[in-house]
Structures are given as C-alpha cells and as structure tokens.
Regions:
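N-terminal Sec-pathway targeting helices
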Residues: 2-13
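Bacterial N-terminal signal peptides
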Residues: 13-20
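Electrostatic cytochrome c docking/interface patches
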Residues: 26-46
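Solvent-exposed, polar/charged alpha-helical surfaces in well-ordered, non-transmembrane soluble domains
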Residues: 44, 52, 72, 76, ...
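Extracytoplasmic electron-transfer domains, predominantly the class I c-type cytochrome c fold
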Residues: 72-127
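C-terminal capping alpha-helices of c-type cytochrome domains
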Residues: 112-120, 126-155
C-alpha cells in the first residue's frame, strides 16, 4: 500500500521533469531548410518560436485564456503585445520575398540583441518552454537585419 502511494506521489514530478527536458532540449531547426533565404529563415524562426501567439491580431486565445484568474492577464498581455508590434504582415512579407518596414525590422532586431522576448512569465510556463530564441536563431535574425538595413535603408553620404 505504501509503495503505491509513493509511486503516485512521484509520478507527476517525474513526468513534469521528463516533459521539461524533452521540450527544452528540442530546439527549433525548421528554419535551416531556408539556408539560401534569410528572410524566410527569420519568418520560420518567428513562427517556430510562437511569437505570433501574442504578436498577431489574428492569434486565438490559448486554452487558458478564458479561465477566471489567468484569463484577463493573458488577454491584456496579448493586447499589449499587438500594440507594440503585430508581426503578421511582416512574417507574410518575409515568406513572400517582400520588403518589411524599417520599424518592424528595428523592433525584431532589438529583441534578438537584447533577449527581451519572450517575457519570463510566458517562457517559464510549461506549455511555452522552448519558445526563447537560441544563439543560432538570434544570429540569423541579427545578420538578416544588418543585411536588409544595408541594402534598403542606407544612403550615400555626401
């Protein structure tokens, strides 16, 4: 009887640890198939890391978005995220080889440089583990931003 109780008491923590290891150890690598196109790589990185879950006007509420205590917080966070930047048009433009705005470029570049996204309260929740940019993804975004800025947003000095 006592062994059964201990087995049940340890099942949940052990299961959560296994899930955490599995989720955090599997980095996104889908973007690598676009090695010849930095713009598509960036679009893929933003999608894979679930940036559009908050930074898109079209993002559906997550399953916990209507729960009594957490729901209003989630809804307010999503509204604030879209107010800061809606990545929908940018990702679509990148996927279709179209130019992006200099403002969106600067915001995404700054985020990659500073590591400020996703916020800790988002990335530390079990259902969002693994959404932070890794060093390779940051390098791709920074390189892309530098190249786009050089090609589209610099002028000859007099």
């Amino acid at each position: 009887m006592r062994k059964t109780i201990y087995a049940k008491m340890t099942a949940l923590p052990v299961g959560l640890c296994a899930l955490a290891f599995a989720v955090t150890s599997c980095g996104s690598s889908e973007y690598k198939k676009f090695a010849d196109n930095e713009g598509k790589q960036v679009a893929s990185i933003l999608r894979e890391n679930d940036c559009l879950a908050c930074h898109s006007e079209n993002a559906p509420l997550p399953f916990y978005g209507n729960l009594p205590l957490i729901g209003p917080v989630v809804q307010a966070d999503m509204k604030e995220a879209v107010h800061y930047v809606d990545l929908t048009a940018m990702v679509e433009a990148l996927e279709n080889g179209q130019p992006v705005s200099e403002v969106d470029l600067a915001k995404v570049e700054n985020t990659a440089l500073s590591g400020s996204m996703p916020p800790a309260k988002y990335s530390h929740m079990p259902m969002h583990w693994g959404t932070s940019l890794d060093d390779n993804e940051k390098a791709v975004i920074i390189s892309w931003a530098k190249n786009v800025r050089k090609d589209r947003f610099t002028t000859e000095t007099v």
